[in-house]
């Protein structure tokens, strides 16, 4: 078993100011998006669409607003609505954590629609350009989660090579033991807990880095190297992220205040299903639209 290093969540101390790793990872993610965007400007078909470096800079302004506002509101509404309705001022305590990817996704989508309207472009043309810029930012965010030792995975077999002990999960581990006697006996977890006061878990943050971040980036980046029907790149992002997140959620510990919902699925999985379905529908629409336009021009 591997013991999580339990990093200091503060990366840099500047007198009374503290720069946290999680915030730093957001910065890394936005920088990565800019770099990927500038690389995409070199593609002939992208340049022919009139994209410029200034467009990328302006997109990032909209993207930051959409990510932060959408991510926070998504967490408030999707995950802890009852709490925040009772404590409305706590909505603004972003330093205490609480961001939702699905909320951030909706926020960025609306922000890109606004950007498209101002630039007189079709919003799908904008999201097609942006989609390959997103996954490395997601990977950076999940790395921030791992450094913080949060959003850990479900309890697993201690003999598994990926099994990891998370000091931050001690209280959850103690509460987990009496609820799962069969697994405790099967995996000899009582002995493990007696020795470490922790239980082995999936490092699900690393799985998300690999699937939602690195793998999805290469799939989108390679797919977007050639001209595709409008909406196809955006559709592939929806399908790819939705499938990756849905899969990883089987190894990720559900939020303790929600648990598993209908059909034994987590909130993250239920929110990912519409993304997958919308992506499939959009992909079919994109290619049928191109075929119809080609037939009309023939």
From Swiss-Prot:
One of its GO terms (molecular function) is phosphatidylglycerol-prolipoprotein diacylglyceryl transferase activity. Pathway: Protein modification; lipoprotein biosynthesis (diacylglyceryl transfer). It is a multi-pass membrane protein. Keywords: Cell inner membrane, Cell membrane, Membrane, Transferase, Transmembrane, Transmembrane helix. A 1,2-diacyl-sn-glycero-3-phospho-(1'-sn-glycerol) binds at residue 142. InterPro entries: Lgt. It is found in: Cell inner membrane. Its EC number is 2.5.1.145. One of its GO terms (biological process) is lipoprotein biosynthetic process. One of its GO terms (cellular component) is plasma membrane. The chain crosses the membrane at residues 17-37, 59-79, 97-117, 129-149, 204-224, 230-250, 257-277. The keyword Transferase applies. Catalyzes the transfer of the diacylglyceryl group from phosphatidylglycerol to the sulfhydryl group of the N-terminal cysteine of a prolipoprotein, the first step in the formation of mature lipoproteins. Belongs to the Lgt family. This is Phosphatidylglycerol--prolipoprotein diacylglyceryl transferase. The lineage of its organism: Bacteria, Pseudomonadati, Pseudomonadota, Betaproteobacteria, Burkholderiales. The gene is lgt.
């Amino acid at each position: 078993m591997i013991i999580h290093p339990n990093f200091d969540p503060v990366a840099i101390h500047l007198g009374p100011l503290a720069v946290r790793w999680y915030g730093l990872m957001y910065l890394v993610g936005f920088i990565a998006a800019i770099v990927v965007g500038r690389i995409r400007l070199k593609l002939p078909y992208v340049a022919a669409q009139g994209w410029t470096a200034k467009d990328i800079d302006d997109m990032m302004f909209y993207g930051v607003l959409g990510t932060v506002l959408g991510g926070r509101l998504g967490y408030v509404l999707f995950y802890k609505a009852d709490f925040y309705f009772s404590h409305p001022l706590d909505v603004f305590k972003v330093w205490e954590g609480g961001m939702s990817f699905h909320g951030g996704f909706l926020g960025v989508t609306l922000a890109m629609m606004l950007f498209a309207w101002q630039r007189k472009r079709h919003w799908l043309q904008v999201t097609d350009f942006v989609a390959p810029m997103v996954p490395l930012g997601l990977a950076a965010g999940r790395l921030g989660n791992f450094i913080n030792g949060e959003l850990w995975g479900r309890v697993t077999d201690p003999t598994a090579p990926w099994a990891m002990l998370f000091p931050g999960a001690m209280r959850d581990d103690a509460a987990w033991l009496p609820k799962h006697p069969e697994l405790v006996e099967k995996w000899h977890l009582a002995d493990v807990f007696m020795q470490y006061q922790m239980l082995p878990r999936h490092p699900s943050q690393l799985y998300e880095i690999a699937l939602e971040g690195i793998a999805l980036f290469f799939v989108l980046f390679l797919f977007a190297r050639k001209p595709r029907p409008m909406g196809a790149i955006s559709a592939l992002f929806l399908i790819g992220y939705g499938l990756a997140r849905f899969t990883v959620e089987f190894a990720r510990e559900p939020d303790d205040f929600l648990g598993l919902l209908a059909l034994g699925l987590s909130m993250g999985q239920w929110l990912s299903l519409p993304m997958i379905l919308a992506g499939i529908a959009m992909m079919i629409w994109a290619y049928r639209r191109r075929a119809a336009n080609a037939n009309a021009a023939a």
